[in-house]
C-alpha cells in the first residue's frame, strides 16, 4: 500500500508540479515530507501526517521548517505534531 502512495507522490512531482507555481510554505516541501513520512511510518500513519501537513499549507499559515517527527506517539495529538514546526518570523 505504501508503494502506491509513494508512486502517487512521485507522479505528482513529475507530471503535475512542474506546471504549477512553487507555493509550498514549508521546508521540506509537502511532497518531500510526504515521501519521508510514508517511507518511515507506512501508508496509514505517514499518510495521516502528510494530510495534516498539506492541510496547513495555505496563505493563512506562516509556514517554516516542519520536519517529519522521529516518533509518532499519538497521531491525533496536535501538540505533538506542531512541536516540529519552526515558524518564519520575518
Swiss-Prot record:
Name the record gives this protein: Putative membrane protein insertion efficiency factor
Family membership: Belongs to the UPF0161 family.
Cell compartments where the protein resides: Cell membrane
HAMAP family, per database record: UPF0161_YidD (MF_00386)
Alphabetized InterPro entries for the sequence: Membr_insert_effic_factor_YidD
Topology versus the membrane: Peripheral membrane protein
Keyword Membrane part of the UniProt annotation: yes
Presence of the UniProt keyword Nucleotide-binding in the record: no
Any single Gene Ontology cellular-component annotation: plasma membrane
UniProtKB keywords: Cell membrane, Membrane
Top-level taxon: Bacteria
Physiological role: Could be involved in insertion of integral membrane proteins into the membrane.
